[in-house]
Amino acid sequence: MGSNISHYLNRFKACLKIDKTIRDGVAEELCTHLEEKSRELEENGLSKEEASKIAVQSLGSPELIAQQIYETHAQGSWKEALFSALPHFLVALLFTSYYWQNIVYVSIMLALIVGIAIYGWHRGKPIWIFPWLGYYLMPVVVTGILLLSLPEGWGWIAALIYIPLALFVFIHIVRQTARRDWLYASLMVAPMLVTLTWFSSLGAGNELLRDGMWLASLQTNALWIVISFIALAAATIAFIRLKARRYKIMSLLIPPLVILFSVITASRGNIDYWGWLILLFSLSAFAIPVWMQARAYQ
């Protein structure tokens, strides 16, 4: 394979954000086509370098070809879209029916989510897995926040021990996801965005656990919480079904706005310093991958 062809294929694969198996298969087909074209040109008297250069130029921009192939393969089926949104609908159903107060139902749902996430992870990471992974990581994030409710001094000591381990797990999974596509990383952290923003509005640490105040707050704000998860489900369905990458990016920018509006409206702006810090952190964690891909798209 000539250097021109190799460079062309590397650019093509770098721009094509689809399943690795499909991407490698398409790249192999392109490679075969380019090598055949190059051999034909060599038989007509051109040097190997000139032949490979003309073959590459005749095929066109690798970025444009990658975009066209992406739009062909990026659209998921309705089955994949609905299954991707299913965990959001299940959580919304929990709050609608008030089953979130029943530890049995919550435990069953958590076990279901963990099982499906592990199954999907070991089955090649299909497109529907990423929202499920977000809920799979949820206990890791929530545990870190609840550690701050320990007696003064002990909470920070426990957090200093726990947080590095939690970050290791979180970063490992995010990196594995981002290798396929940064947009999937945003799709994955979306459930954590909702949870952290509502934590910030309901209180944190001792305030969250004291005298059942958080239960009363959850009951009061249940409708807004349901709206947040429904918005997340709708955006997930749109993301899976849309073809063009720019529209996928736009669909992921809608939930943060809906959730931010819901939280501020429900709390009437009464969010303390730590609450705003958690809120801004969670919004940034969700929006940064989308912003990076928007810049890359431009």
Where are the regions a protein language model picked out?
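Soluble N-terminal domains of membrane-associated systems
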Residues: 1-70
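Charge-dense, low-complexity polyampholytic segments
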Residues: 67-79
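Hydrophobic alpha-helical bundles in membrane proteins
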Residues: 76-298
